[in-house]
């Protein structure tokens, strides 16, 4: 078992707590990453949003990929699990970017968390088309094939509904062979079919152990039917540490009660 944490690129992760004592700044996250290595953490997940959906759209948010490149240069053991949304990145260019960061970090420390987008307002404000749910997954499927094959082949060409690549060469290849680890999560049938075929690890939100167990069983069976290596799994969770269970439950109620006046409330359920 390995342990990681979400890098506070938005200044924390609680929508209704204005100041969590974490800055959305390079200075803060770089110190945190180096300290987390000393404490024995295995990885950090670097979320990707151009607007801050936690503290409100006017609040600062760090760019995922430039932050990952910088962290690769100042850390030595921490896996950098960088979120990427295919609607915001051309696959050939992202494949090149990722391979370069993999060399900066060394030791196969770069991995991808592929997210098929969810925030319509952000896409509109940044001039990106926001497609319907299943169309986004169809795009992601093409995107993943191009990225994977460019990491493994040269003089690669592809013609699909969403992307076209003509005789592309990508050098240097990633240090991680056969490719950097690809994580993804999702509950829909389209998501699970895509992930079981094209990804290496399935990540889930925290849930009752019985439900997590069922998700693991389902994805493992899908993977086995495809004749692919066993799927890896990850679960996200919050840790609340207090002196008594009563205090812990009180804190749980406080941090999960998202009020309408919270700066990030407007984006809370925008799928």
Give residue ranges: language-model regions.
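Short, acidic/polar
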Residues: 23-36, 94-97, 184-194
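Active-site mouth loops of central-metabolism enzymes
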Residues: 13-27, 83-92, 129, 176-187, ...
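Hydrophobic faces of well-ordered beta-strands that scaffold small-molecule active sites
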Residues: 3-5, 44-46, 79-84, 110-114, ...
């Amino acid at each position: 078992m390995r342990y990681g944490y979400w890098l506070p690129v938005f200044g924390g992760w609680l929508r209704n707590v204005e100041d969590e004592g974490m800055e959305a700044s390079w200075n803060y996250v770089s110190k945190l990453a180096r300290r987390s290595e000393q404490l024995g953490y295995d990885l950090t997940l670097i979320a990707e949003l151009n607007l801050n959906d936690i503290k409100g759209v006017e609040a600062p948010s760090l760019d995922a990929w430039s932050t990952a490149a910088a962290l690769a240069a100042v850390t030595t053991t921490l896996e950098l699990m960088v979120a990427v949304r295919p609607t915001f990145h051309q696959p050939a260019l992202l494949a090149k970017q990722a391979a370069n960061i993999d060399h900066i970090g060394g030791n196969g420390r770069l991995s991808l968390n592929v997210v098929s987008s969810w925030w319509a307002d952000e896409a509109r404000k940044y001039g990106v088309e926001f497609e319907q749910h299943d169309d986004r997954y169809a795009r992601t499927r093409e995107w993943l094939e191009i990225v994977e094959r460019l990491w493994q082949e040269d003089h690669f060409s592809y013609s699909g509904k969403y992307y076209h690549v003509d005789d592309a060469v990508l050098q240097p290849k990633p240090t991680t062979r056969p490719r950097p680890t690809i994580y993804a999560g999702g509950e829909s049938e389209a998501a699970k079919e895509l992930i079981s075929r094209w990804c290496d690890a399935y990540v889930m939100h925290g849930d009752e152990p019985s439900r997590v167990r069922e998700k693991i069983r389902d994805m493992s069976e899908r993977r086995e039917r495809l004749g692919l290596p066993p799927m890896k799994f990850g679960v996200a969770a919050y840790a609340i540490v207090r002196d008594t269970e009563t205090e812990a439950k009180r804190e749980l109620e406080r941090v999960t009660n998202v009020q309408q006046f919270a700066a990030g409330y407007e984006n809370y359920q925008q799928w």
